[in-house]
């Protein structure tokens, strides 16, 4: 996920009178609980977040997509441990306990590029699958209402 715009906005007064925090573009965001727990996104804009979002701001030089992919992998593993008949909840302690392998920046970029290409391929396949599902739904409508007949 990438965030390039928001649907809602806060005024400066709104930020000051709430628990919202401002984050700068390039921040890795993690949903901490609820239906979106564990979902990661990179903010490509300065934005306000609430207490349900954890902002990760690296203090080292790291490829952001590599970091996102590494954290996503760790979250997938953690979700299996956290789910006990309900939705998983994360907190900063759980995320801070993740151990990250940090190869050189060129290797991080190479890994990130491969994973990004895989993500793009998956997105295209998912889009194609959705299109096929719509075609099937249309065909079902035509066949089941008798608008189109099947020859025996």
Regions found by a protein language model. Give the residues of each.
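Basic, amphipathic alpha-helical recognition segments used for DNA target recognition
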Residues: 2-5, 25, 42-46, 51-102
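Conserved beta-strand positions that form and line the central face of beta-propeller blades
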Residues: 9, 55, 149
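A generic structural signal for residues embedded in beta-strands
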Residues: 30-31, 117
